[in-house]
Amino acid sequence: MQKILESINLDYAFMFTHKKVNSISMEGFEKFFADLPVDPYIKDKYRYRRLSRFILSGEEVIKQPHGYLFQSKSYNPVPNYGDIKREYAEIDDKLVALDNFQKMILAFCDSCKIHPEAEIGIHQIRTICSPNHSGNPAPEGIHRDGTDFIGIFAVNRHNIQGGATHLYTNRKEKPVFSKVLNPGDLLLVNDHEFLHFTTPIKPVVEEVGYRDVFVLTSPSLIY
């Protein structure tokens, strides 16, 4: 079982930051998104997903045992999402072994000053759209995840428009940050300070489009 550590210092002056991570190449990621299983908890089957949890020991990334994702309805009101244990297939070990995947975890942990014993959850997500159906990267609407820190690392945008990520201090106010995340972009967010949302995606031309991202959280919310 994961530890939610009281010693995590949230006085650290990190609120949110957006940066391009030039040291991480997208090469090698694409094939691992092509075979993602469908998210069984999303009604319209437009999302594909894997999930694993890790800890960082020094600069060694250590995969943790399989577990279940749990968020309360107060954070995730989507039917079949909140207040239930959700189980997803693990991220492929061959992907975990990639140098660029491990660099991504190190960049997240270093930037957010993640406690050495804190778990990191990594969600590998593809959201698809078609001429007849938009894809919704954030079916929860404007929300928090119920964790300390969130990282969104953009891997690919294929034949899509939309998909802008917004940050809010209040649901009733305009976003304080709004940007389409392009491949190699990393957005880091203090989940205690900001709500987040990503707008739906639609295809640019009349064929399937998709958005590929890794979402990193600490704590992992996996039990």
Functional labels for PLM-detected ranges:
Residues 1-78:
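N-terminal auxiliary "cap/dimerization" subdomain that precedes the catalytic jelly-roll/cupin core
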Residues 5-13, 79-91, 163:
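Glycine-rich, often proline-containing surface loops adjacent to acidic residues and nearby aromatics
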Residues 39-51, 110-124:
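Short glycine-rich, low-complexity/disordered patches
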Residues 51, 57, 123-125, 154, ...:
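Structured loops at beta-to-helix junctions and adjacent beta-edge loops in soluble globular domains
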Residues 53, 141, 150-152, 186-188, ...:
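Conserved hydrophobic/aromatic beta-strand scaffold that supports enzyme active sites
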Residues 61-121:
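Signature of the catalytic double-stranded beta-helix
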Residues 114-182:
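Catalytic core of non-heme Fe(II) oxygenases with the double-stranded beta-helix
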Residues 163-223:
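Catalytic core of Fe(II)/2-oxoglutarate
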